[in-house]
Amino acid sequence: MLSKALFFSSLPLWAKVASAAFGITTTDSSYTIDAGSPNPLKFTVSRSSCDITSINYYGSELQYQSKGSHIGSGLGSASVSAVQNGDYIKVTCDTDTLTHYFVVHSGDPIIHMATYITAEPSIGELRFIARLNSNLLPNEEPFGDVSTTAGGSAIEGSDVFLVNGQTRSKFYSSQRFIDDQRHCISGSAHRVCMILNQYESSSGGPFHRDINSNNGGDYNSLYWYMNSGHVQTESYRMGLHGPYSMYFSRSGTPGTNIDTSFFANLDIKGYVPASGRGTVTGKASGADSNFKWVVHWYNDAAQYWTYTASDGSFTSPAMKPGTYTMAYYQGEYRVAETSVTVSAGSSTTKNISGSVKTGTTIFKIGDWDGQPTGFLNADKQLRMHPSDSRMSSWGPVTYTVGSSSVGSFPMALFKSVNSPVTIKFTATSAQTGAATLRIGTTLSFAGGRPQATINSYTGPTPSAPTNLNSRGVTRGAYRGLGEVYDVSIPAGTIVAGTNTITINVISGSSGDDFLSPNFVSAYPFLTLMRC
């Protein structure tokens, strides 16, 4: 009985493998693509809308049946065609301002994609969303259920929820672009991963982050956000976005090094092959070696980045020709920039050097890394709402230099929650001359910015920062334009002995609780320097 049971249970698997046949099946309404892969993958694309309406992998239907997978919220209508050329199938979806491609290589359980645009979509963001069966694919990777909102009650807008006493949001699935080469959703028998080979036409730079996944109950969403208005810090880029790849597997997590160079032979709009690109090599120096160093290249058409080696040496990704701003970061804090010109088929050598420049420091809170790392609740803010019961109390806080820990200083100040923050420090008689209080921030909301009072002296009201028109801290963001505020302190203001600084959030706007005007602390938040 055992051997008979084993034989019959293996027969469907054998049949599935044997039936895999690479090709296109065409009907009046759709194209069905068979990848010809050992673990069979078939998917169906609507000929009228470009929606994926079915994804059958290893005998299971993974596509959510009530709504398709698509660009944006769906193209609505498009001119859709499909061609097979040897070992490759290409589906092309055309609108007036957008062309989307699905590409399959014979034998691979992968849907490769690329999206070419000449204008930003009317919804104000460019994304691909795969709406997949949440019963078969309930899990989100790598951050788990922080973005599983199924069964929750909305507590902020329509995108932050309370689920079993924990705050959750699709925004809490985000990862910095420089670290996000793969994100996945999975179940006991299937895994689907988005593999990101190319961010060159996206926006925001290496430290930008956006939504990656969201199990909302009816379906589990796997995204690639190419651009959006979510803490948007630079203009959108046109041209070809991608290639990017949706990889299907049974249990293993695929690697991120996927060769898509075959796109060069498939007549893909805007695709620049390796032969049409160049690189930049060099050495970075001068920044604090306690932090990772990043080199970043950007212009209106493209962006690239890389971590340096431990000795500062670097080689850029293959870049499109052009002249680029070249920036150098200590952590996420920019310490230098220059320009460099890249030519096709050649490597350009360009070194870069820079460091944090300060005067004689009386005290500082935190490190010059462009992040709120180490401050109160910074270890939780990426993955939960500030109101979450797992957060430590936001204060108001009194911080005493020399005895308080950096971890007791709030990573963000909210006008209606924990403003002001009070700092006490002791000065010697030699430190009572003119000084500068430098307050570094990474992100502002609703015009929130710091105004400082040192003993009886109140510094000037700073101008309002650029309005990014996007919720930040409550949706797991901390990086915006990075305003730094210097407050000149007249001689005699600081006294020998105990001194008190209070920093208030000021703004012409108002709001409740964590949606009141606020800013994120970093750089460090505060350095007191002798002039």
Curated annotation (Swiss-Prot):
As given in the record, the signal peptide range reads 1-20
- Spell out the InterPro entries in the cross-references: Carb-bd-like_fold (IPR013784), Gal_mutarotase_sf_dom (IPR011013), Galactose-bd-like_sf (IPR008979), GH-type_carb-bd (IPR014718), RG-lyase_II (IPR029413), RG-lyase_III (IPR029411), Rhamnogalacturonase_B (IPR016590), RhgB_N (IPR015364)
Per its UniProt entry, what is the enzyme's top EC class, as one word? lyase
Any one GO MF annotation of this record: carbohydrate binding
Q: List the disulfide bonds.
A: C50-C93, C184-C193
- Which reaction does this chain catalyze? Endotype eliminative cleavage of L-alpha-rhamnopyranosyl-(1->4)-alpha-D-galactopyranosyluronic acid bonds of rhamnogalacturonan I domains in ramified hairy regions of pectin leaving L-rhamnopyranose at the reducing end and 4-deoxy-4,5-unsaturated D-galactopyranosyluronic acid at the non-reducing end
Kindly state which keywords UniProt assigns to this record, in alphabetical order. Answer: Carbohydrate metabolism, Cell wall biogenesis/degradation, Disulfide bond, Glycoprotein, Lyase, Polysaccharide degradation, Secreted, Signal
Q: Which GO terms describe its biological process?
A: cell wall organization; pectin catabolic process
GO CC annotation: what is one?
A: extracellular region
Q: Which residues are glycosylated?
A: N351
The entry's localization annotation reads: Secreted
EC number in record:
4.2.2.23
Family the UniProt entry places it in: Belongs to the polysaccharide lyase 4 family.
Function (record text): Pectinolytic enzymes consist of four classes of enzymes: pectin lyase, polygalacturonase, pectin methylesterase and rhamnogalacturonase. Degrades the rhamnogalacturonan I (RG-I) backbone of pectin.
Instruction: Spell out the protein name for this chain.
Output: Probable rhamnogalacturonate lyase A
Originating species: Aspergillus terreus (strain NIH 2624 / FGSC A1156)
What's the encoding gene here? rglA
